[in-house]
Amino acid sequence: MTQQELTLYNLGENLDQLMNLDPRGYGVCRILYPAARALAKEPLTIHGAKFLVSNIKGGELVYIITGFVLLPFKKAEMDGIVSSVLLARSLIKAFGAKPVLICPEENLKAAKALTSVAGMHCYESVEEVQQFPISM
């Protein structure tokens, strides 16, 4: 194993462990992660990053599906929206991608506000996203 391979492996292991923290004790990640890891044969974060690097081309649309409504409160969750907007910005900067965020209506207000904070423009149509730079 080269130094670069070891670094990627360790980085992926650390990120995977961080993302599998289960402070509420639901246990779902502990059930699903081993099967996904066995299929990928490497840390899932590294596997996903390699997939993005291999498949995203400049100017292409990338669909990001995120968000859900917390029942019975009928309030939108926020961590997925924040992460998705930051992912969109990263895909624009790294690849020149054209991200399209798909989320429940309850998440739209937050998504639009976060888009501005992340230095992007938010449009209602895919055509506008394709036309204008740094947009989502």
List each model region and its residues.
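Positively charged, low-complexity intrinsically disordered leader regions
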Residues: 1-61
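Short, glycine-rich nucleotide/cofactor-binding loops
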Residues: 36-41, 61-62, 66-83
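Fold-independent oxyanion-binding glycine-rich loops
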Residues: 66-68, 104-105, 134
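Histidine-anchored nucleotide/phosphate-binding helix
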Residues: 77-96
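Short internal beta-strands
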Residues: 98-106
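Glycine- and small hydrophobic-enriched segments that form the cores of compact globular domains
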Residues: 100-101, 114-116
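Short, charged/polar "capping" segments at the starts of alpha-helices
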Residues: 106-113
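A glycine-rich helix N-cap at a beta->alpha junction
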Residues: 115-136
